Amino acid sequence: MALAGAPAGGPCAPALEALLGAGALRLLDSSQIVIISAAQDASAPPAPTGPAAPAAGPCDPDLLLFATPQAPRPTPSAPRPALGRPPVKRRLDLETDHQYLAESSGPARGRGRHPGKGVKSPGEKSRYETSLNLTTKRFLELLSHSADGVVDLNWAAEVLKVQKRRIYDITNVLEGIQLIAKKSKNHIQWLGSHTTVGVGGRLEGLTQDLRQLQESEQQLDHLMNICTTQLRLLSEDTDSQRLAYVTCQDLRSIADPAEQMVMVIKAPPETQLQAVDSSENFQISLKSKQGPIDVFLCPEETVGGISPGKTPSQEVTSEEENRATDSATIVSPPPSSPPSSLTTDPSQSLLSLEQEPLLSRMGSLRAPVDEDRLSPLVAADSLLEHVREDFSGLLPEEFISLSPPHEALDYHFGLEEGEGIRDLFDCDFGDLTPLDF
């Protein structure tokens, strides 16, 4: 190693060489040495050199050596550490549940974790079982089973197997929101809902009522299905269409005429019906946009009289009853009777309301008919042929036909104050002789 930074033959060079030769200094090849020496007096003799040289006296120069520290040179096989980062001391082991393990594990410092800590014993309760939420639910369940809503807190703590202070925590909250009230020190009463007292019996009764309603609903659905099937067969079956009619006797057999009034409603399709059932009276509202609505009264059959559904009877006392007879007429005649057509034109009405008292005294107008067999009403012309002789003394010789007959839509219009019934028909009533009664 060469010395640099000092002139050759300087006073410090021999001393430094002596130190290096003796092995007193261990320097590397890359070490740098800085030598600082003090000035020497020129009159002083030179100091001897060599290992046996005496120590320098007060006049000897001071020699200060400074070496720059250097890190050891890395070997070519070792990886060079990254600048600014500490060397990696851990590695990732994916086979040990993603845990970082040290390369060399030393003895654990401090107190180690007990191996049995965190493992619950079989008899230990979970956190949810001891929670206040579950305890409150169980306490309210005890309140619901109480007959009068009063619960002893000591008994509740024993049943729930919890500390009494937790029962007090629950009761304090419930008392604060006015759901319970303290009867005494250890007794509380439920005030939230009085329906909870004895709710089991009421629940059983309501369940039974619901079961009965479901059975009734199923029975009604079954009857509605039967009626729907019968109506479809009645309207679609050819053999059943000829029997699609109803008589006054059928209507009177449904209800007692002495206590109930039977009314027949003849309405066009798509008629809206609204019924209001109140405690005082019963109201029915009908509304139709397709045509007029006819309402007929089914009269009560008197003793010795004949049903209006068989032949015209003198028992009919109003125009509504005459119209009820028309509605009860057979739509299609049975096979035993000859086919005939029924018309409801005003020209075929027999008598007015003023002539009916006279007919009531004429017993000959009653034609004998079979009570067991029903026949449709015949036309007015055929009836006049049978009773023409009986009317000879009371009525004119001929009836005037009111023509042309009006249709259903013609009755939607009314008459003015100066018009009468003759203005509805194109005929002359001047030749008619007034009837004197």
Curated annotation (Swiss-Prot):
Phosphothreonine modification, residue list: 433
Region annotation Leucine-zipper: where it falls in the sequence: 153-174
Annotated source species: Homo sapiens (Human)
Residues with Phosphoserine modification: 364, 375, 403
GO molecular-function term, one example from the UniProt record: protein kinase binding
Modified residues (N6-methyllysine): 185
UniProt keyword annotations, A-Z: Acetylation, Activator, Apoptosis, Cell cycle, DNA-binding, Host-virus interaction, Methylation, Nucleus, Phosphoprotein, Transcription, Transcription regulation, Ubl conjugation
Known DNA-binding region: 110-194
Annotated InterPro entries: E2F (IPR015633), E2F-DP_heterodim (IPR037241), E2F_CC-MB (IPR032198), E2F_WHTH_DNA-bd_dom (IPR003316), WH-like_DNA-bd_sf (IPR036388), WH_DNA-bd_sf (IPR036390)
Stated family: Belongs to the E2F/DP family.
Name recorded for this polypeptide: Transcription factor E2F1
Location of region: Transactivation: 368-437
Post-translational modification, as annotated: Phosphorylated by CDK2 and cyclin A-CDK2 in the S-phase. Phosphorylation at Ser-364 by CHEK2 stabilizes E2F1 upon DNA damage and regulates its effect on transcription and apoptosis. Phosphorylation at Ser-403 by GSK3B promotes interaction with USP11, leading to its deubiquitination and stabilization. Ubiquitinated via 'Lys-63'-linked ubiquitin, leading to its degradation. Deubiquitinated by USP11 following phosphorylation by GSK3B, promoting its stability.
Listed result of changing residue 411 to C: No retinoblastoma protein binding. No effect on interaction with and repression of CEBPA
Region (Dimerization): 195-284
Region (Disordered): 42-87, 101-128, 300-349
Result of changing residue 185 to R: Abrogates methylation by SETD7. Loss of interaction with L3MBTL3. Loss of ubiquitination by the CRL4-DCAF5 E3 ubiquitin ligase complex
Superkingdom in the source lineage: Eukaryota
